Amino acid sequence: MNNQYILIIDFGSQYTKLVARRMKDIGAKFIISSWEIKKKELLKKNIKGILLSGSPMSVLDDKSPYVSKDILNMKVPILGICYGMHTLVKQLGGKVERKSVREFGYASIKILKNHSNLFYDNFEVSEKNYTKRQKVWMSHEDSVINIPKGFSIIASTKNCKYAAIFNKKNKFYGVQFHPEVTHSEKGYLILNRFVKNICNYTNVIKYSLSIRKIILKIKNKVNDEKVILGLSGGIDSFTSAILIHKAIGNNLFCICIDNGLLRNDEILKIKNLIKKVGKINVIYINHKKRFLKSLNGITDPEKKRKTIGNLFFKIFQEQADILKAKWLAQGTIYPDIIESSQNNLLKKDNFIKSHHNVCPLPKGIKLKILEPLKHLFKDEVKKIAKKIGIPKEIIFRHPFPGPGLAVRIIGEIKEEYCNILRMADEIFISELKSENLYFNISQAFSVLLPIKSVAVMGDMRKYEWVISLRAIETLDFMSANWANIPYKILNNVSNRIINEVRGISRVVYDISNKPPSTIEWE
């Protein structure tokens, strides 16, 4: 019983793995478990504390998940996060309601005088980690309106009286916000205090990303069989390619497909990048007409993603048959899986969006799947990429979705629309680079909207399309802020797009954060 663990109860939140990530940062061993786990399953584990995750569900739903009473009676500290706080409150006799005012994104919490150890506010010189107000990240519609007997308020916001609560006797805590998200400015410190000071967790370990272990795992899994990998030009597929190549050498074949939905001169750029990473087998294929034909008449974003994903798989299988390859490698990372996952306790419409590399394999696909990065976040992938010598322009190249421009053209896909968007996007990115802003922004791109707007050009009335610019700043792509690009630069981008791209009459800038908005529009 020397090993100590923090138990993370998963209610289907997209942030559950992010909670686990924070445990890794803190140095705590953890177990992620379904909410249906029973106490008897944990008898041989030294559980020092419990974290209850968020959820897309509501405790007001008839079939809302909850932990069993024997878990609540384990006599260890418990911290409920968002939904986790709601279910804790409801099970202990409090009340939760859906309020007319929702909170998504930043909120300022005021820490009250009757603080707990969770919000340590000793303001001596050596302990100024906390202030009486903190910025936190909210994502909720329901709110606690009555707390159970024995609980006190720790913090409030303008719209949420019970932003944080605690029961001193039982060491039960609840926070309405998400401390696991990097945008909660003191979130790490809150979780760190819960684990080390409240749970008295002492078995601190140092997690490390072992490249050698990843390569060895690939080698042992694949043996002497051939692997094909869809190379997109982004950091995820490039890092996967280098790791797999180190493991199996020339048994790796990278497939680079021009599907007509790529950025401007993308294939040429990929060829130039390949020269910088070494001798890797790359096969270039042009399937523009095939992809555009398959998307004819489709407007629903999920159907677009699945159509593209299925066609990718079919082409990979065709190439695998030619090469006699048994494996398909993908640069899937954990946020892809989170957005595509459907927990079995959830309704079907609670998943966020499908990713082409996380779709179920279509019929007729015989390939085995290899995903060396699937448990890693983007910042972890960047650390590995840097260690294995991948050039900076790949590491910090902005992500590009697998379905490409298809999810940046709202509505039906036409070659004409692709050309318009490609030109607008190239202008936006080139302006960011010329102003030395590109590498300071996590992701930037243009979106072609399915609406037209009136303009006057050369004394003539024009009724043409609208482009939306999107730029965000983020560490792990699980939450994001819109990038505060100077007006002068936005003005230059807008003028150039309207003057240089035929068919565009108006340019707008997207100032939505994640959550609630996803980074991509579709």
From Swiss-Prot:
Pathway: Purine metabolism; GMP biosynthesis; GMP from XMP (L-Gln route): step 1/1
Single annotated GO MF: ATP binding
Reactions performed catalytically: XMP + L-glutamine + ATP + H2O = GMP + L-glutamate + AMP + diphosphate + 2 H(+)
Domain Glutamine amidotransferase type-1: from-to ranges: 5-204
Annotated active site: 82 (nucleophile), 178, 180
EC number: 6.3.5.2
InterPro entries for this protein: Class_I_gatase-like, GATASE, GMP_synth_C, GMP_synth_GATase, GMP_synthase, GMPS_ATP_PPase_dom, NAD/GMP_synthase, Rossmann-like_a/b/a_fold
Keywords: ATP-binding, Glutamine amidotransferase, GMP biosynthesis, Ligase, Nucleotide-binding, Purine biosynthesis
Record note on quaternary structure: Homodimer.
Role: Catalyzes the synthesis of GMP from XMP.
Name by which UniProt lists this protein: GMP synthase [glutamine-hydrolyzing]
